[in-house]
Regions:
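N-terminal acidic leader/helix
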Residues: 1-29
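Short, charge-rich amphipathic interface segments used for partner binding and complex assembly
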Residues: 32-73
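Short intrinsically disordered terminal tails
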Residues: 1, 81-82
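Charged/polar positions within long, soluble alpha-helices
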Residues: 15-26, 44-58, 76, 80
Length: 82
C-alpha cells in the first residue's frame, strides 16, 4: 500500500469534511451548490485514497488524466451492505 498517497488524500478529505461541517453549522447562507462542490471534493479524495492505494510512488506522482478519472470514481470492490 502506498501509505503516503493514501494519507495525503485522507487528510484532504478530512479537511473538506471539517470545513463542510463548520460551514453548515455557522453559515446560514450555505446552500445546495456549495454542498455539491464540497461533497464532490470530499468523495474525490476518499475514492482516490481507496482506488489508488496500491499504485507506486512514481505513478501517483505522474498521475495521468486517465488515472485521475479512474481513481476518483466510486469504488466497485467494497461491500457496502455491512
Amino acid at each position: 500500500m502506498n501509505k503516503d498517497h493514501v494519507l495525503f488524500h485522507l487528510q484532504e478529505a478530512r479537511e473538506e469534511l471539517d470545513r463542510t461541517i463548520r460551514d453548515l453549522r455557522e453559515n446560514p447562507g450555505y446552500d445546495y451548490g456549495e454542498f455539491v462542490v464540497a461533497m464532490t471534493h470530499l468523495y474525490h479524495h476518499v475514492n482516490t485514497a481507496w482506488n489508488a492505494r496500491d499504485v507506486s510512488h512514481e505513478r501517483a506522482e505522474t498521475c495521468s488524466e486517465d488515472d485521475f478519472r479512474q481513481w476518483r470514481q466510486f469504488p466497485t470492490d467494497l461491500e457496502m451492505s455491512v
